[in-house]
Swiss-Prot record:
Domain description: The protein kinase domain plays an important role in its localization in the cell membrane.
Protein name (Swiss-Prot/TrEMBL): Tyrosine-protein kinase Lyn
Reported modifications of this chain: Ubiquitinated. Ubiquitination is SH3-dependent.
Gene giving rise to this polypeptide: Lyn
Positions annotated to bind ATP: L253, G254, A255, G256, Q257, F258, G259, E260, V261, K275
Disulfide bond is among the record's keywords: no
Domain (SH2): residue spans on this chain: 129-226
Keywords linked to the UniProt accession: Adaptive immunity, ATP-binding, Cell membrane, Cytoplasm, Golgi apparatus, Immunity, Inflammatory response, Innate immunity, Kinase, Lipoprotein, Membrane, Myristate, Nucleotide-binding, Nucleus, Palmitate, Phosphoprotein, Proto-oncogene, SH2 domain, SH3 domain, Transferase, Tyrosine-protein kinase, Ubl conjugation
The Protein kinase domain, residue ranges: 247-501
Lipid-carrying residues in chain (N-myristoyl glycine): G2
CDD domains: PTKc_Lyn, SH2_Src_Lyn, SH3_Lyn
Amino acid sequence: MGCIKSKRKDNLNDDGVDMKTQPVRNTDRTIYVRDPTSNKQQRPVPESQLLPGQRFQAKDPEEQGDIVVALYPYDGIHPDDLSFKKGEKMKVLEEHGEWWKAKSLSSKREGFIPSNYVAKVNTLETEEWFFKDITRKDAERQLLAPGNSAGAFLIRESETLKGSFSLSVRDYDPMHGDVIKHYKIRSLDNGGYYISPRITFPCISDMIKHYQKQSDGLCRRLEKACISPKPQKPWDKDAWEIPRESIKLVKKLGAGQFGEVWMGYYNNSTKVAVKTLKPGTMSAQAFLEEANLMKTLQHDKLVRLYAVVTKEEPIYIITEFMAKGSLLDFLKSDEGSKVLLPKLIDFSAQIAEGMAYIERKNYIHRDLRAANVLVSESLMCKIADFGLARVIEDNEYTAREGAKFPIKWTAPEAINFGCFTIKSDVWSFGILLYEIVTYGKIPYPGRTNADVMTALSQGYRMPRMENCPDELYDIMKMCWKESAEERPTFDYLQSVLDDFYTATEGQYQQQP
């Protein structure tokens, strides 16, 4: 296609720290230490050391692997749910996606349980410091989130070497502020573990207890486990087209050209966001066809579509609730206006990650902008409203020159010829970067839509903003290439933004 491409830099060097003297690459908030043994082939990890729970398929009643313990309490909502207390043990009878049928070992009652509220007994998943299925970058985001401080830590599975683990620790550096340091946990042939070869441990739990007593060569002593918010329970089994009366609208969060957004509750129990569409915005049939595609797109950086109400107007779209609202509103708020550039870059990287997933799925957003990105309590960004623009039937929108069409965010080929592709989304992402770095200002300030269309046809591009680094502006200009095929991929954009602050000069961390 002629697009700029780049492979993600997922190598062992970026994943951990060895306790020997070795060169370090500094970032603004993170320190990565090269692993001098990364070019050596590691011995296969024995099955007994694989991440517990990964092969949880067999349902032999005699197997200990069927026993799970509750990480959080759960009050059942439906008659066939099984309520339980934190610490209660249950035997899994059947797995049904995100809901499992189980039997309490204490009460002997049976029912359905949310699978993300439990963990297999005698595994790392029962430990509050173990974060399953988390990337290195998201581990850094979690540790830097409000509520954590220096000494906060977590254990995660290595992204690059299945069955291996890494320790991530929040530290404070006078020159760089809060930083995250990653330590690779190595395995012994006999099943033990170590970070420094000076001292080994029979299990990871013993290792954690040791480093909670003294730093012993780590950047600092381990203190509290990284805060882990209680997960939202999985959506109800087979609840897609739901009754309107099952939704209670509680608080109006905002209003747009095509409807309103509310905080509400489903069945008086699950907090959700509800988008109510103005009558005539789109046909129920066209929306349902698109929604059936949208609900298959599931990623940490995409807002989860739960259910719909389409039997009569207004159409309701039920999604996961994001506490901080839209990125646009957040950037304009008192809290958002105090966010520093490194976090703004991180917002951009998170959005690029979500769009890279959409890119891999051969899908198109069509309306990517700060108003359609939502922010969580822990400042995680998720992309919303992907695909909806395709089924809007409003004449002022479909005309493309109409007042409701987002001209300033749209690529020239999409404005002029209706040619929407993932590359037109890349153009929009460049405009979104402008919104982020200006804390929510409208692009092309002082220009009308007509002025913008004329200027773009003559090669005009927005100039660099005063507080925008040259390197970030270079990324914007790449997104605004006239030829769609010359624009970068979202995979490339994610890799560049993830490593935006990576220094090129190596430093050294001394062996303890």
